[in-house]
Amino acid sequence: MIAKVLSGGLLGIDAYLVEVEVDISLGLPIFSTVGLPDGAVKESKDRVKSAVKNTGYDFPSQRITVNLAPADIKKEGAAFDLPIALGILTASDTILSTSIKDYLIVGELSLDGRVKSIHGGLSLAVAARNSHLKGIIVPKDNALETSVVKGIDVLAVEHLSQVVDFLNGIHEITPIKVDIESIFNTQSAYPVDFSEVKGQEHAKRSIEVAAAGGHNLIMVGPPGAGKTMLAKRIPTILPRMSFEEALETTKIHSVMGLLEPTKALVTHKPFRSPHHTISDAGLIGGGTIPKPGEVSLSHNGVLFLDELPEFKKNALEVMRQPLEDGKVTISRAVSSLTYPARFMLVAAMNPCPCGFYSDPHQECTCTLPQIQRYKAKISGPLLDRIDIHVEIPPVRFRDLSTERTGETSKQIKERVEKARTIQQERFKGKKIYCNAQMVSRHIRKYCQIDESSQRLLERAMEKLGLSARAYTRILKVSRTIADLEEEDHIQPHHISEAIQYRSLDRTLL
């Protein structure tokens, strides 16, 4: 007898339907799986056999053939354990109901029949809804993330016997429901705040501008100046995530198995801070079946690269495409996958190997060739893609000793959100969301400047030797500064401030 159970596989951050066909026939008791299974899928036969027996059901002593269709796509992971077990029990008449065809079923089985969590539950739920299925049966640990998808029943299970009893009509399983609005309200607090940062008003202003326009930022300063402290507080002033952004971000984290069972959605802007020893594949993504890297895990959030010159030069150079396009494409012989990678890059570095080149109180011990080699690790093309450069001086004693606190993250965030609202109105229907994403045609339309601003910008270009890409970055940042001041037109003082944020072109190149 042949039984068919619907399951799903992952391709990038999206899912596709997999039809699990189980045939039980006369012959030697051999269990074979076809349809391009990987090692984990091939090993499922031992997990399934033990789970079925230890749950109290009879396991057929006949030839069992499992086919995973479509057969031309490689299947990976242990999520097929549960549908294979249910297919065997259906083919052997232990499950008599025909309602199994209405559900997409996924789950890894332990040897005692418990159903364990899988990766990509949210993407699989979206695939079930798009295929007009009645519902999806998932492990309990994946219930919250899958329940944010409306239009299908999400049935959370803990044991193989629970699924069998449900399909045979012995017990009911109540679909899981979540309140999306309450999720956003209860998961929106941050443990850090900008009011904790002493001094550094110029740096705070540059970070506010960067957050308001979604601009990339690099901070240069001696050790202990507060670069890391400032960077970790950037997510606290970024605009609240929309449901669409949260859904897309959660998909990526779910596929990588990074979503906590107690969270339905990633509602905080991601903040990723990889170590400088990270490989190209770890940063951009890769593998035989390509997986997302850090640039995709920081999608809709912040990617913080501390000690930027210590990263491998090749790892930094491969970031050019995602910085420019907001996505990363990984090509392999068997497939080519594109992952979203629209993030705010925040980098930090010392001015020299010892860190005290610009410190007025500490003597720099580096030679000029050492400093030049250190700075040369950051290429001009990469630096051109970073809109805002800011020098972070050492914190003054009077700033450290004062009891007065600076602005809170909430106060700064209000101004940032006002500026973003202006940008959303400006770019309505254009598939871009902030000033940093503008391309040439948008810059020509929305970044027009008067004659005095033009002369000011021309002098700066000649004096600093700025590139054509740096010219467009200045215009984008000027537009953001004008938005923060709720000005319709870019004024000369907006241009002047934006030029200040390119001054490191002269010292780094």
Identify what each model region corresponds to.
Residues 1-218, 222-228, 331, 470-471, ...:
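Peripheral, non-AAA+ core regions of ATP-driven protein-machinery
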Residues 208, 264-265, 270, 280-303, ...:
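Conserved alpha-helical scaffold flanking the Walker A/P-loop in AAA+ ATPase domains
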Residues 245-279, 286-287, 393, 433-442, ...:
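Conserved inter-motif catalytic segment of the P-loop NTP-binding fold
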Residues 300, 306-307, 318:
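Walker B catalytic acidic pair
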